[in-house]
Amino acid sequence: MAIYRLPREVSFPDPDLAEPDGLLAVGGDLSPERLLTAYAAGIFPWYGEDTPILWWSPDPRLVLEPERLHVSASLARTIRRGRYRVTADRAFEDVVRRCAGRARPGQDGTWIVPEMIDAYVRLHRLGFAHSFEAWEGEALAGGLYGVSLGGAFFGESMFADRPDASKVAFVRSVEWLARWDVRLIDCQVRTEHLARFGAREIPRAEFLARLGRALDRPTLRGRWDLDAGDRPAGA
């Protein structure tokens, strides 16, 4: 099957036209309009330093429903000890850059290339992209970032500089997203790490149907502040 080359105008082909590995289209740009259109259609960018922009919609899709979150006994003990303090949107760009600097098994370079960093920083300034940070004292120890649309959160990447820091940030992020009535967390493709937290694969058709329902909910746009109570500041 031929790979669809994106036109200048913002549009995407039907995700059902994706290759078996999930590759759907090539080209385009990382403008806020195109990125938000992609996420709303269940499509995300993922490419390397020496390739054009590639767009994906894998089948099956890895998702986490907050009510299915599994926390191991050892991680629960770490959380109870209070080693890390978790915040939201305090260090978005730092989190993205730390994620970009992490080597991944089987990858020669990073997929979070400079233009990707710039694109998500723009989304953050527009109130659609968010980070959760784990701090040890005043040091950023770990974190994650993603995109929020309607009642869905699209996780992008995480990092840890200290033991369990990203895991603590992840657990707290899921707990807060559930409190804000986010019911669908997109984890994109299966990893054993996320599966241990309770993430599971579902058919793409089911994911898109659930995403459509999630998008009927209002987007929690703006800077998130975990000290703001039951709703993030700006929402």
Curated annotation (Swiss-Prot):
GO terms for biological process: protein catabolic process. It is found in: Cytoplasm. Gene3D superfamilies: Leucyl/phenylalanyl-tRNA-protein transferase, C-terminal domain (3.40.630.70), Leucyl/phenylalanyl-tRNA-protein transferase, N-terminal domain (3.30.70.3550). It is an enzyme of class 2 (transferase). Keywords: Acyltransferase, Cytoplasm, Transferase. PANTHER family: LEUCYL/PHENYLALANYL-TRNA--PROTEIN TRANSFERASE (PTHR30098), LEUCYL_PHENYLALANYL-TRNA--PROTEIN TRANSFERASE (PTHR30098:SF2). This is Leucyl/phenylalanyl-tRNA--protein transferase. It comes from Anaeromyxobacter sp. (strain Fw109-5).
